[in-house]
A protein has these predicted regions:
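Glycine-rich phosphate-binding loops of nucleotide-dependent enzymes
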Residues: 1-239
Length: 239
């Protein structure tokens, strides 16, 4: 299942936020987009998932142009997003939040129960707190819930927007371990992340965005060792 973005342009009113970006995510990969605030990373994910309109360019999902397709149709094809800010329903229980993730599913209760157990296996804390309101969870637990809800739709490609935002270092490590585990089950991942160190350590390939442009693309390990990337995004110079 290949996701390909070709020469994408996206506007907010008269302001061009994405300026001719091309990105490829091959089946089975973790690909990360890194860059400073305002680089266009979140806009990219919103546009891919159908929450922002395309000005020009193409979004191809397994060869099919989905650029004009409504968000729910894209979800039916196998795109799922865990958004920035998590977007959980604070007044609903953990279980109810997870059940919201399967709104596009038409399979039997047995299969849905199996998927719920898979989510609980990845995130045991969610099982412990199944009947707690989402709003009572810690930031890390809410992030687990957002990812778990996205997984309930059985995605082929998972879009993750800033999963480490606002989390303590130990929880960040935990979340990235789980992202790696999800990928090993066969889910392709496009990851937007300001924690460039963790993102580049986990990804197969990476793109660097600056003010709506791709300025670098390479294997993640190569970017991790790139002196310019280290100085700009990892807080270190060349060694």
């Amino acid at each position: 299942m290949r996701l390909e973005i070709k020469d994408l342009h996206v506007h907010y009113g008269k302001i061009e936020a994405i300026k001719g970006v091309s990105v490829v995510v091959n089946e089975g990969e973790i690909v990360t987009l890194i860059g400073a605030n305002g680089a266009g990373k979140t806009t990219m994910l919103k546009t891919i998932s159908g929450l922002r309109p395309v000005t020009s360019g193409q979004i191809l999902f397994n060869g099919e142009d989905i650029s004009k397709m409504p968000a729910h149709k894209r979800a039916d094809l196998g795109l799922a997003q865990a958004p920035e800010g998590r977007g959980i329903f604070v007044g609903m229980s953990v279980l109810e939040n997870l059940e919201m993730g399967k709104y596009n599913r038409k399979d039997r209760k047995k299969e849905m129960a199996e998927d719920l157990e898979k989510v609980y296996h990845l995130f045991p804390r969610l099982k412990e707190r199944a009947f707690q309101a989402g709003g009572t969870l810690s930031g890390g637990e809410q992030q687990m819930l957002a990812i778990g809800r996205a997984l309930m739709s059985r995605p082929k490609v998972l879009l993750l927007d800033e999963p480490s935002m606002g989390l303590a270092p130990l929880m960040i490590q935990n979340i990235f371990n789980i992202i790696t585990e999800i990928n090993k089950t066969g889910v392709t991942i496009l990851l937007v992340e300001q924690n460039a160190q963790q993102a580049l350590q986990r990804a197969h390939r990476a793109y660097v965005l600056e003010v709506g442009h791709v300025v670098k693309e390479a294997k993640a390990q190569d970017l991790l060792n790139d002196p310019a990337v280290r100085a700009a995004y990892l807080g270190t110079g060349a060694h």
